[in-house]
Amino acid sequence: MEPEALALTLPIRRLVEFLLRTGSIDSRFTGFDRALEGARLHRKLQRAAVKEYPDYQAEATLKQDYACAQITYTLEGRADGIFTDTDGMPTIDEIKTTTLPPELITGEQSPEHWAQAQIYAAIYARQNGLPAMRVRLTYFQVDEELEFRFSHDYTADALDAVVTDLLTQYAPWAKRAAEWQRISRASLAALQFPFPGYRPGQRAMIGAVYKICTEGGQLLCQAPTGIGKTMSVLFPALKAVGQGGPVFYLTARGTTRAAAENALALLRASDAHLKLRSVTLTAKDKICMQDRRECTPEACPYAKGYYDRVRTALWDALDTHALTADALQMLARRHKVCPFELGLDLSLWCDVVIGDYNYLFDPVVHLERFFDTAGDYLFLLDEAHNLPDRARGMHSGVLAKSAFYDAKKRLGKGKSSLKNALTKVNDIFIEWRHRCEEAPGDSRFGRTFFEKSRADTLDRALTRLCEPLEIWLDEHRDPDETHEALLQLYFDIRAWLRVADTFDDHFVLQISAHGSEVRAAMLCLDPSDFLTADFAKGRAAVLFSATLAPAGYYRDLCGLPDARAVALRSPFDTEHLGLWCARHVSTRYKDRADSIAKVADLLAVMSGARAGHYLAFFPSYSYLQQVWENFTARYPDRPTLCQESAMNEGKRAEFLAQFQKSDGRSLLGFAVLGGVFGEGVDLTGESLIGAAIVSPGLPQVGPRQEQLRDYFEQTRGSGFDYAYRFPGMNKVLQAAGRVIRTPEDRGVVLLIDDRFLAPDTRRLMPPHWEQLRVVESAETLAGELERFWGRAASLEGKAVSSPAR
């Protein structure tokens, strides 16, 4: 019986780089931004070629099937140019930019460049019945702006032989990938839900996700805590992988990636026959195994010779199905390769890729190997309420005067073109400082002004600065403090110019001054157009969170006007949650001083009604500190814990560990609303039995927030809602969601501010908040809490712990 024929679509560039690339990882300064400068120079050379050769076709798409070793390959790619040379020979032109010194550009330094062009020539010759083709490599040396051309003529048979040889080398990889896909798809088709039953709402969520993943489109899914969101999106997406894939599980925070890893581990444990390969992409600084990250062959043994060893490492790694950060580091040590780059290379061989939002949405670091063109991908976005703000940040740019002044000082005395260029940029910032001094506002807190157009004068000065800065960086490669400062400045300038190229009426330019410092910021007010284009790169997308209301707001800002939306009810018994609003307190900025003691009293009553752990969330650090000082002075016997303004991962873990202790005592934690403890924290059972949300969480009124308000008032007619009310209520609901994490949990939530009762705010509350009750004093709250905990005790059939002392 003949073996079943395999079919595989393969990008030509990926094929040749995979098989032929050698050498080391070297992330040192290369003299130009490869993506931007390379594309610009390609276009420049192509325009010149069109003038030289009238029939020159730039960016010509080529696609052809080849059969080799019982595999049918569909090879596809884009030739930089196809033309008829002066002697009548049809020619493929492959253009490469390089920073190699001119004397090292021989035409033989990169075999993969020849192979790429030879495959293009083989396809063109086959499709046009040509007996021979010419292949030309055009190298452009960017520092000297010199062009080098190298040509070879080949018969069509010789070109076909090159293709056959490369495909024969690739055949073991293709067969392994095809065999994995066959058994993986079969095992996923047979995969059963890993639990004996479904939680309330879970079946509906699974059905909605499966429908989107199979039919295509986008889904906004609001799923309260307890439904099991992670499994409810991963399970149906994996069942639908035969209709598309791979699956990208994207998160806003590194801590939530563990939820996806745990869900996949549970699926594997529930089905011994499941064949599912996943990789977790971890930030380079976190997964680096060196004491100091320096990605050069001289400094890092894992970078040196990476491309010589990576294929052996990949072949070995494909036997590991859960490629977590720990697994990648283990493999990297075994094969002496970089774990970060290994994870990226492995992503092409995986069914599930877990990583940060930026791998899809950030124009600088998105995964080019997937997203330079559209594919049959499934996107699952956890904590999707964070996407609009994250996207704004990805498409904004910031520069500070001090960075240019500091760079100039570091260069010492003496004149140079670099110092002159830095001075011209610095002078622009000084002019802006004078304008800021004339702007309205209190100079003690800084002054600012806005423009609706980009900073053309600055952009021109920055463009002129790039060349001498590149020359200096190329001549000073030792990684000392001055080099690092100027290299970071160069990257910041490039990032700024990249944003400037996209500046339109969705942006605003802000210039602000405080003392001698001046900052320029291009602020992306509305990222929806960018997100629309990003989502179009996949087959389907599911955006899910406990807080995606109102749906129209998220459809709008996420660039998904046609997305379906589902909102599921909480699966928990509403009797388990005690919910009150303290109407007698105003936390408006003008009323803050009068509110401090009242808030402290309410917190004392809440945390004293039953021994346990509580969190109180505040709109700012300063307000938090004021209430904490009042509380600890008046209730010195109550244990408290205070979030600090800058906490590393270790300190955050220590903070949360205090809530895991079961010592029978009360603990009241003070945290910032919308901060690291306000979402993505899972404290079940007695770890957290109450939360107070102090204020409706409206973002602080300021120049930037008012720009958002004005923009959305003009474009949507809902300025206050888009800039203040909706983001604020989202933070409130996230913080309140820290209480009641399992069906057995019981807890209380206290909303402190009369504005929670405004009709427009009440409309944003979820259905399971229907039992919201109003209290007018701390004494009234004490009575309400006594009754709530008394009912809870009778239902539990045991005595409630005595009040905290």
Model feature map: region roles:
Residues 233, 258, 335-352, 357-466, ...:
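Signature of the SF2 helicase/ATPase Hel1-core->accessory helical subdomain module
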Residues 214-236:
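Walker A/P-loop
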Residues 328-353, 363-370, 471-586, 590, ...:
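A contiguous, basic/glycine-rich beta-loop/short-helix subdomain that forms a polymer-engagement track
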Residues 185-186, 192, 245-353, 361, ...:
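A substrate-engagement module of RecA-like helicase motors
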